[in-house]
Amino acid sequence: FKKPALSDYLQRMQPVIKQGLTRWQKKARGNQFLMYPELKRLTLDIATEVFMGEPLGKAADKINEAFVDCVKAGTAIVRYPIPGGRWQRGLRGRATLEAFFRSRIAAKRREPGSDLFSRLCIAEDEQGNRFTDDDVVNHMIFLLMAAHDTSTITLTSMIYQLGKHPDWQRRLRDEALALGKATLVHDDLGQLPQMELVLKESLRLLSPVHVLPRKTVKPVDFAGYRI
């Protein structure tokens, strides 16, 4: 999360964003346009480009579905692999993600790039120890899930709030146009204070992570309930 790395990420994001927005314009012309699924696809495309150094291509829909099933499994009441159940779909999604990342580890170690996936594959400590394949797979699944899912929810919340407050929508548009450039560098982000205000207020009103499951370290009675 140092500035040189963040600057590099921003530059790698912009062609993906431009491609996504072009797709949106074609899709939205005269049609109903649902923001959430399109944002989810875009943020996953960005995350894989930045953290993996490669586009998902034809695997995009399959990987996106696997992520969704894993997230939904976290709220499953019946945690047993009943066919067709939420937990079973989550386990199947997890297996899909594990196979996807595991199949790419050897190539990343042979020809590493500057992406985070490559760095995890070749990272060594002072004694020359590396992450195991399982370590790399678990890191990548968590990273991409956290990166694209929370970003999607946050951006969707922002768009929802801007739809309710068109005056702020105009203010953000004017602020962005005032930069006078089609692509941004890292220092430009400091020139968008109103954008930051809307982002933070959206996070305050609608948290992207609103449930955190916990369990007690030992049985306890609370408010008449045995936990």
Indicate residue ranges for each PLM-predicted region:
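Conserved cytochrome P450 K-helix E-x-x-R motif and the immediately C-terminal K′/meander segment
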Residues: 99, 103, 182-223
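Generic, well-ordered alpha-helical scaffold segments in large soluble proteins
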Residues: 20, 50, 73, 99-108, ...
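Short, surface-exposed loop/turn segments at secondary-structure junctions
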Residues: 26-35, 57-58, 182-189
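Cytochrome P450 catalytic core segment centered on helix I
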Residues: 44, 55, 65-129, 133, ...
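Transmembrane helix-loop-helix
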Residues: 9-28
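Cytochrome P450 catalytic-core helices
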Residues: 43, 148-175
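Secondary-structure capping and boundary motifs in well-ordered enzyme cores
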Residues: 35-40, 70, 89, 93, ...
